[in-house]
Design a protein with these regions (language model features):
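Bacterial N-terminal signal peptides that target proteins for export
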Residues: 2-16
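Residue-level micro-sites within transmembrane alpha helices that shape
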Residues: 11-12, 26, 238, 267
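Non-catalytic cap/lid and distal C-terminal segments of serine-dependent acyl enzymes
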Residues: 36-64, 68-367
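Boundary at the C-terminal end of the N-terminal hydrophobic targeting segment
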Residues: 28-30
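Bacterial N-terminal signal peptides
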Residues: 15-26
Length: 367
């Protein structure tokens, strides 16, 4: 028997928790980190009594060098305003990386550990918490028969969900991340709340599994990926999808099922598109690390084009995987496999790009 435990987090409660944490931080006065000033600059603080040098490295610009006061607290501010957005950052204390211990918002990932700086926009961006109906985040523990181990997955259900059967998007993370990263850092739930509220996307369930079916154990990606993708795909089809369809009001038809992923998750997506297209009608690959293309017969190619209503591939021209995406797209085009290929100018391999890709991709689903 497949046992499950679940925890459910209404998104409005998560927003309230953030406000409580901000209130507690305010009471600590000078201990707040990060602290956003009215002019848009951000101040960081760190206690490191015996350190000789402390700096902050983040996605928001140049490194910030901190100075120590008489109490042993290091502090420093960005020299220019930080634009609204969601950023990763870390302290470098005498050359060693550290999270911001005063900031409760930590990016879920296997390595390296980073803290999250979220500056809301005016008006709100899709990834900001807004005063609109919110869905619910569920966290499930389950036993995988394929992998013979206990696993975890995250499920987003849209606001106002009833017993009506809904389509499902299976959404995979990248190599250094885990099943919680798409919500806690990618803000997938807030993005879908916004798109559904604006009627840009249809109500759907999003399932975010652990895309590491095999522990990477420090292996380089190219050596690790083929076996991991085979194991993940089998677990997805034999454990995860049946689990979801037995616990949620889901339309089980492949026409109501999509898969997307970023980087390593994009590797999974393209593998599924070419090898298991009968199970999905929509596939999205965001900044993918493309897999090897299997030997495909004319009949295989006909089936792929028939099964997939959309094969959406996107990559930035500043991404280190751009050349591989170019080569992959050229090869499937040569094979007459239909796809929608998007090149994003000046985009690199980072979460701001992938949030935008989720915003672009989900409105195309289940129409």
């Amino acid at each position: 028997m497949n046992h499950s435990t679940a925890m459910t987090f209404p998104i409005k409660h998560l927003a309230l928790l953030s406000l409580v944490l901000l209130g507690l931080s305010a009471e600590l006065g000078a201990q707040v980190s990060p602290e956003l000033a009215d002019d848009g600059r951000v101040t960081f603080r760190c206690r490191a009594d015996h350190a000789d040098r402390v700096a902050v490295h983040g996605q928001f610009g140049a490194a910030v060098e901190l100075e120590k006061d008489s109490s042993g607290t290091w502090s420093g501010s960005t020299t220019t305003p930080v634009k609204p957005g969601v950023y990763e950052y870390r302290f470098k204390i005498d050359g060693r990386d550290s999270i911001d211990s005063r900031n409760p918002h930590i990016k879920p990932q296997r390595w390296p550990n980073t803290s999250i700086l979220h500056i809301a926009s005016t008006p709100p961006a899709p990834w900001d918490i807004q005063d609109i109906p919110h869905g619910t985040i569920h966290r499930h523990s389950y036993h995988s028969k394929v992998l013979e181990q206990d696993r975890e997955l995250i499920v987003y259900t849209p606001p106002g969900m009833t017993d009506e059967k809904l389509p499902v998007l299976y959404l995979a993370h990248g190599y250094s991340d885990n099943q919680r990263t798409w919500t806690e850092h990618g803000k997938a739930h807030s993005i879908l709340d916004s798109l559904i509220h604006e009627k840009k996307a249809v109500p759907m369930i999003i399932v975010m599994p652990d895309a590491h079916a095999i522990d990477p154990g420090g292996k380089k990606f190219n050596a690790y990926a083929p076996k991991n993708t085979e194991a993940f795909s089998r677990e997805l089809l034999e454990d995860v999808i049946p689990f979801v369809e037995s616990h949620y009001p889901v339309n089980p038809a492949s026409t109501h099922r999509a898969f997307a992923g970023l980087s390593m998750g994009g590797h999974h997506a393209l593998f599924l598109a070419l090898s298991h297209s009968e199970n999905f009608s929509y596939v999205g690959a965001f900044s993918a690390a493309p897999p090897a293309i299997p030997d495909l017969s004319p009949q295989d190619i006909t089936a792929i084009n028939k099964n997939l209503r959309l094969l959406w591939i996107a990559c930035g021209d500043k991404d280190f995987l751009f050349a591989r995406n170019q080569a992959f797209h050229a090869k499937i085009k040569e094979l007459n496999i239909e796809s929608d290929y998007q090149i994003t100018p000046a985009a690199d391999h980072s979460w701001p790009v992938w949030r935008d890709y989720l915003i672009d991709f989900t409105p195309k689903l289940f129409r």
